[in-house]
Amino acid sequence: MFLGYSDCVDPGLAVYRVSRSRLKLMLSFVWLVGLRFHDCAAFESCCYDITEAESNKAISRDEAAFTSSVSTRTPSLAIAPPPDRSMLLSREEELVPWSRLIITKQFYGGLIFHTTWVTGFVLLGLLTLFASLFRVPQSICRFCIDRLRDIARPLKYRYQRLVATV
């Protein structure tokens, strides 16, 4: 496995062993990334909820201003006429796209959050599978060990000469 020791028992069957500390570290990293995406999605939905509440307050303020202006223009004994029906319909039509937008944003925010988790785990699984099948850790370790030996040989001889002269 890419994160630890891997061994192929049978051809085509990969058995990997991961140390618990590395597994915990990896899972906590994936959990934190997912939590960050969840916070972003929740923040967006909160923003849209606040925007919807503010638009509702603005509409109720407009209605209050409209009724107060109508009542101040009419004599005190007369009943104020009902608000214009076309104005109310246009306000309702303005609210419909907002509510649809909020639902759409919440849906896609949750969808993005869950697809991120699933995609992350699938990619991690494929990475570990291919790393164990092609013995990537062993080849990387062999390469590093060979390079370290190449570097260490001259240093070893220099150290031996230095010790011999002293």
From Swiss-Prot:
The protein's assembly and partners: Interacts with host IQGAP1.
Gene: UL5
Record's protein name: Protein UL5
Organism: Human cytomegalovirus (strain Merlin)
InterPro entries the UniProt entry points to: Herpes_UL5
Keyword entries, A-Z: Host cytoplasm, Host-virus interaction
GO cellular component, one term: host cell cytoplasm
Location of the protein in the cell: Host cytoplasm
Protein role: May play a role in rearrangement of cellular cytoskeleton towards an efficient viral assembly and spreading.
